């Protein structure tokens, strides 16, 4: 786990999980999120916020925090402290630049490697990040261990229509459309 005091100038090549450290992908993603005209703003964010408990005085963990939007929202809703982590050095750097709140701690770490104190958080949130992890059961066990008794875990993942590989039409040798694959 990397803290805010360490140097991130020599980042390794991004893994498939960490495409956000590819400079071209990151800038395209940043532009997309700045427009906020996609499904995140229209559906996912309001749905997630609608599930939240009262955050006043709560300790919150944000897994896959991206630009830190939820961390800042949690503090605006009265959370006592927020720990937010992301595997992407670019995301953590951007989140820190956008945040001026000492009660929010950003960590450069993968969700799989995140180790927290037992029963440290009232709420754990993960917005559109768990579909990147390989060992979902292990992460859920860690989340459960990190929650205080009566704590809440709220998460979203991308819909399979977004993550499925598009197959497209089956075509003949000349490129003419023959049919759509029956088991897409």
Describe each region flagged by the PLM.
Residues 2-55, 69, 73, 91-94, 152-184:
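Conserved class I S-adenosyl-L-methionine
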Residues 52-55, 118, 140:
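A short, aliphatic-rich alpha-helical micro-motif
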Residues 53, 99-100, 134, 148:
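Short conserved AdoMet
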Residues 61-63, 67-114:
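Class I SAM-dependent methyltransferase SAM/SAH-binding core
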Residues 115-124:
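A short acidic, Gly/Pro-enriched loop at the edge of an enzyme's catalytic core
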Residues 123-137:
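A short SAM/SAH-binding and catalytic strip from SAM-dependent methyltransferases
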Residues 137-152:
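A short glycine-rich, Lys/Arg-flanked "PGG" loop and its adjoining helix->strand segment in the class I
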